[in-house]
Amino acid sequence: MRRGDPPPRAFQAPVDVHASADGQVYMFRHRQEEPEASSEDEELNVMELRPRSRDSSSKEKEGVGEMLLLERDISHEDNLSKLALQYGCKVADIKRVNNLFQEQDMYALKSIKIPVRKHGLLTEAISELRTPQQRPSHDAAPSNSAMASVSGRPQVQEYTNYLKEVDNDIERLIQNTDNVEEVFSASSRVSRGWGWRSQRLRSNGADWGIQWWNAVIAMLLIGIVLPIFYVVYYKTKDSGESAVDNVGVNISVSTSNSTREYNGKSP
């Protein structure tokens, strides 16, 4: 046992068992703090790990600094696999640099960025590649002016488009109102020309287009005039038949009397 070493401690179980009326109770103890020596060892380990992380980060930065982004105009025959084989890079790197999700997104761009190694053969031998700062001036000028115009007055353009849409809607409403007025005027002219036909069309169809006074007259005819006419007709008919019968009886009586007188005068 060396000087400065902590004295050995007896073994202590992590659980104390106590008896109770219901059964046994298990008491768990909290873990005691480790001695200062362990904390010093951890500090030494941390101090040893720090320079390693710095070295790895510096290496990563050096690796990133070795790459250079160059641009190339896109043609219809290009694709990501062809560009990756031609310039010795990965398809995933080209997608990551240009923010491409699919291969078809490449054809929406005029030029594509290709990651190549700095001071390599491709940067010196191939003339198609150029840095993003070396774009032609005639392409940069209109793009800058367009961006300035778009970013300068976006709201004004939206307002003008909105006002144009409102004007178009107003013109459509005016045309629709004119058409409706023409239809109403034509229908009014037709109603004036046809007279009673237009009035008949205004009925709902359940009363056959008959007015209330027409219905009253029809009821008077059916309920009063026709029964009176019926009674008068049959009474006159009965009186005529009785008169004819009386005349026939009188004629027959007179004929019988005349025959009797004639028979009495004869020898």
UniProtKB/Swiss-Prot annotation:
Membrane topology: Single-pass membrane protein
Predominant cellular place of this UniProt entry's protein: membrane
Glycosylation sites recorded in the entry for this protein: 79
Positions of the LysM domain: 70-114
Gene Ontology CC terms: membrane
UniProt-recorded name of the protein: LysM and putative peptidoglycan-binding domain-containing protein 4
Compositional bias ranges of the Basic and acidic residues kind: 49-64
Keywords: Glycoprotein, Membrane, Transmembrane, Transmembrane helix
Biased composition (Acidic residues): 35-45
Cytoplasmic topology ranges: 233-267
Stretch list, region Disordered: 30-64, 130-152
Membrane-side (Extracellular) residue stretches: 1-211
Transmembrane segments: 212-232
Cross-referenced InterPro entries: LYSM1-4, LysM_dom, LysM_dom_sf
Gene that specifies this protein: lysmd4
Domain of life: Eukaryota
